[in-house]
Regions:
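Classical Sec-dependent N-terminal signal peptides that target proteins to the secretory pathway
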Residues: 1-20
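Second-shell loop/turn segments in exported
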Residues: 105-115, 173-178, 215-223, 247-249
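Intrinsically disordered, low-structural-confidence terminal and linker regions
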Residues: 21-54
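Active-site recognition of the HExxH zinc-binding catalytic motif
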Residues: 184-199, 230
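Short pre-active-site segment immediately N-terminal to the catalytic Zn-binding motif
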Residues: 171-187
């Protein structure tokens, strides 16, 4: 399918969603990503190497923009604010480094901050490498080489996690009422915004898969094409990188074309899934 037709299809879906203003005319298989559960086990291999404490800031040194309030209707705005943080560097086997900023309003001491950073750093080491570290064959929205996750802010509040692909960072809100303790699937969701979205959304095979499936994997995936990618990636991992036979059948029945399109995309772009073995 040529690029013009692909763009036309994208515009058509966006227009229809804006006009409908509701989910009732859209089909989806799972109500939310949490219905998938965790796809990574505690003892699974990890590319995480070490966590280094760097320092604790003072005087409200850092400026950032919060996630939106966690509301069913997605209302509310992000707020820019100043904060202090315990700063850590997580190092992975490839040498990739992620800066962790643990807000002092959430972690009241360095021990709690380190425990939080270490927990998430280990989980991030278990997800596919191309989500964590990007790839020379992927690029972001300003056409620069995808660098994957470079910074994570662990903050206080029942807010929505959100990713900023320009800054290669995302927010983690452990107090978010809809997030499970393991959080591996939502980590992959946010990581996909930093590494995968831009190039995949211009892929003709992926666009055709959206048309052919006539189904979204979750209710939230209907929000936008970027959210469709981000929601789908964890289900692809469940199908191709784990032994969860029961749920595989349900996923493949719902979005077989997207799963196959991701297979091709990962292979064609030589994307590493380390430490997971996917196929």
């Amino acid at each position: 399918m040529n690029k013009i037709l692909a763009i036309a299809v994208l515009c058509f879906w966006i227009f229809n969603f804006a006009e409908a203003g509701t989910y009732k005319d859209r089909k989806y298989t799972f109500k939310s990503l949490s219905n998938l559960g965790s796809v990574i086990k505690k003892g699974d291999p990890t590319d995480f190497k070490e966590l280094k404490f760097i320092r604790k800031s003072e005087g409200k040194e850092f400026l950032s923009t919060s996630g939106r309030p966690n509301r069913e209707n997605l209302s509310g705005k992000r707020k820019t604010y100043l904060y202090d943080a315990y700063v850590f560097h997580a190092i992975y086997n490839s040498g990739h480094k992620i800066n962790f900023f643990v807000d002092t309003d959430y972690a009241k001491n360095s021990e709690k901050a380190e425990k939080l950073a270490l927990s998430y750093a280990k989980t991030i080491g278990q997800i596919p490498l191309f989500l964590r570290e990007g790839s020379p064959n992927l690029y972001n929205i300003v056409r620069e080489k995808s660098m994957g996750i470079r910074k994570i802010i662990i903050a206080k509040g029942n807010n929505r996690w959100w990713a900023d692909p320009i800054l290669n960072q995302f927010f983690i809100y452990p107090q978010h009422s809809g997030v499970t303790k393991k959080s591996d699937t939502i980590i992959m969701h946010e990581a996909s915004h930093l590494s995968l979205d831009t190039k995949l959304l211009q892929d003709d095979v992926w666009i055709q898969a959206i048309i052919d499936d006539q189904m979204n994997i979750t209710k939230y995936a209907i929000q936008s094409f970027g959210e469709d990618v981000a929601e789908t990636i964890s289900f692809w991992v469940a199908v191709r990188c784990t032994d969860r036979k029961g749920i595989k059948k349900k996923i493949l029945k719902a979005i077989p074309n997207r799963i196959n399109a991701l297979d091709k995309f990962v292979k064609d772009n030589k994307l590493s899934t380390s430490p997971m073995v996917c196929g």
